[in-house]
Amino acid sequence: MEFDTIAAISTALGEGAIAIVRVSGDDAVEKVNRIFKGKDLTEVPSHTIHYGHIVDLDTNQVIEEVMVSIMRAPRTFTRENIVEINCHGGLVSVNKVLQLILAQGVRLAEPGEFTKRAFLNGRIDLSQAEAVMDLIRAKTDRAMNVAINQMEGRLSKLIGRLRQDILETLAHVEVNIDYPEYDDVEEMTHNILIEKATHVRSEIAKILETSKQGKILREGIATAIIGRPNVGKSSLLNSLVQEKKAIVTDIAGTTRDVIEEYVNVRGVPLKLIDTAGIRETEDVVERIGVERSKEMMSQADLVLVVVNYSEALTNEDEELFRAVQGKDFIVIVNKTDLPQAIDMERVIELAAGNRVITTSLIEEQGIDELEKAIADLFFEGTIDSADVTYVSNARHIGLLTQAGKTIGDAIEAIENGVPIDMVQIDLTRTWEILGEITGDTVHESLIDQLFSQFCLGK
C-alpha cells in the first residue's frame, strides 16, 4: 500500500530540552536531505543518527542545529522510511523546521496518522493500535503494563485463537453440508457442534471476567468525597494526592465547587472528586456547589463518606448514608485527634457492612488503611497485570459481549434442533464480530474515527 509522505511534531508543544519532528513516507529521507547540511542522508545506513543543521533554502540561513535519525523500511513503526529530526525544544525553531519540511512537498499528518499507517501496513492490528493511546494516557504503572501487554499482542493472540477455532468449525460444517458422501469426513453432529460452540463462549466469558478490573485500570475509579462542611474532605484529598490542591480552613463551606484530581492508590488510578460540603445553605454559589456534589455522588463508582469523630451524627450525616446505599462506599471517621462525640456503633450500623476507617488527617493517620481498603474493594488486594490479559477498552468489551450473545444464540439453536447449515449464520457472525476487535473485519469509517482521537504526531 502506497501513501504520500507526512510530517508532524511528535513531542508536546512548549519549551523543553528537545522537540522531535517525525517524517514518514517512501521519499522521507530525500525530502529531509534537501534541507539538511551535513552528511548525505541518502547514503547513510538505516537506524543511525547524524549531526548537522537545517537550512532555509531560500536564504541559505541555518535555522537549527539538529540530530537526525534515519530508519529505513520495513523495520520502522509505520513500515515506511522514517526520519526523526531532534531539535532544540521551543515553539519557534521546531515550527520553522516543520514548515521547511512541508515546503518540500510533504503533507502535515492528521491526528494518529502514523499509527494508522502502522495498522494499514500490517505492522500492528487495531487492538494494538488502540493500546498505543492507552499507553500515552496511562495513569499508573499497572495501567501502563496492561497497555504494553496489549501492544505486544496478548489480546490479539487470544482473539486470533478463538477466530481460528470458529473458522475450523465452520470449515467442518461446510464439508459435511457439501460432501456428505465422503466416508473419511467426520460427521459434524449436534453434540460436537455444541461442544465447540460452548468452548468459544466459555473463552469469551473468561476474557470478559477481566473487563471490570481492566476498565478501572484504564479509566480509573470515579471517587466522590462527600460529607458535611468542615469534616475534612479537602484534607483527605490533599492527603491522598500528597500536595495541597484544595483550600483547607476552619470555615465551613470553603469548597464551593468540585475539585478533580487523579491519584495512584496501590496501582489503582482514582479520579478523586472533592465535593462541596452538603448542607442546607442560603448562599447561592454554595448551593450550586452542593447540587453539583449530589450529582457527582450519584455518578461515582466509589464514594468516600467523611464524618467528624468530634461531633455527634446529624440528620444531614444520616441522609448521606441513605443516599449512598446500593453503591460501593467507605466511611472515614476523621479527626480522631479530638475528643470523641460520635456514636461509633451507629456509624457501623449505617455503614451496613461497608468498611469504616478512623483517621486523623492532621496527624497523617489512617491513610494507609484507607488505601488498602480501596485496593481490597476492587481487586481483592492484588492486581496481577503481569499474568492476566485484561480487556479494558469499551469498544472491545462491547464487541466481546456481542460475540458472547451471538455464540449463545448458536448454542440455543443447536439445542432446539435447528439444522446445522442455519447455525452457520450465528457462527459466522461471531467470527466477524471478533474480527472487529483486531481490525480484520472492520469498516473504514470506524478506522478513521478511532485514529482521529489520537494526538498529532502519533
Curated annotation (Swiss-Prot):
Question: In the record's cofactor note, how is the cofactor described as bound?
Answer: Binds 1 potassium ion per subunit.
- Return the Pfam families for the record: MMR_HSR1 (PF01926), MnmE_helical (PF12631), TrmE_N (PF10396)
Q: Where in the cell is it found?
A: Cytoplasm
Q: Where is the signal peptide?
A: none
Is GTP-binding among the key words of this record?
yes
Q: Which InterPro entries match?
A: G_TrmE, GTP-bd, GTP-bd_TrmE_N, GTPase_MnmE, MnmE_dom2, MnmE_helical, P-loop_NTPase, Small_GTP-bd
Entry binding sites for GTP = 230-235, 249-255, 274-277
Q: Which cofactor does it need?
A: K(+)
PROSITE patterns registered for this protein in UniProt: G_TRME
Q: What EC number(s) would the UniProt record show? A: 3.6.-.-
Q: Where does Mg(2+) bind?
A: S234, T255
Please, which domain of life does this record's source organism belong to?
Bacteria
Keywords, comma-separated and alphabetical? Cytoplasm, GTP-binding, Hydrolase, Magnesium, Metal-binding, Nucleotide-binding, Potassium, tRNA processing
User: Biological process GO annotation list?
Assistant: tRNA methylation; tRNA wobble uridine modification
Q: Where is the TrmE-type G domain?
A: 220-379
Annotated K(+) binding lies at N230, T249, I251, T254
GO (cellular component) term, any one: cytosol
**Family assignment from sequence similarity:** Belongs to the TRAFAC class TrmE-Era-EngA-EngB-Septin-like GTPase superfamily. TrmE GTPase family.
Q: What this chain does, per the record?
A: Exhibits a very high intrinsic GTPase hydrolysis rate. Involved in the addition of a carboxymethylaminomethyl (cmnm) group at the wobble position (U34) of certain tRNAs, forming tRNA-cmnm(5)s(2)U34.
Q: Relate the assembly described in the record.
A: Homodimer. Heterotetramer of two MnmE and two MnmG subunits.
Protein name in UniProt: tRNA modification GTPase MnmE
Q: Which organism is it from?
A: Bacillus thuringiensis (strain Al Hakam)
